[in-house]
């Protein structure tokens, strides 16, 4: 109906470049970096805000650029079903070439023994934290036998001395390496990897 196809690149809206629209409005979005601001901006369809029923867009398709008028819709009129066939219930699995994969959102601390037993002889393990993971990075590090290392530094208040603060090292791992995992550790992150995801990434890097 609107002559839009998967793979089309929308470069302008009402003759204004996408980058310019974002730069003008990003100051109104609360986020730590531009990547997250762009995600929020896109998710809420700010690029297509208008008081009219239609907008003009510039499309790049197959190395050609052309203008198109598209209709605007209410959200309730749109089919926003995600048709991807990704099994979001996967906790862990073995990939080709003897590589392990762990989804940190679908797995939890009760799965650590099972994960280690099945993936301990793999060449590498991919920990996917492009999500909001469950809190068991500590148990993963300990189970994989890594010796204790500093993962983060925290500033804490000295309650016996008002106004005084001190540094505290946050360490994860075992007192000594016990049959440590010998393969490579790969951590998958993206703009969704925030808060607990960031903390989990620091834990796994120890």
Specify the residue positions occupied by each region the protein language model found.
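Short, structured coil/loop segments at alpha-helix boundaries
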Residues: 1-3, 32-34, 99
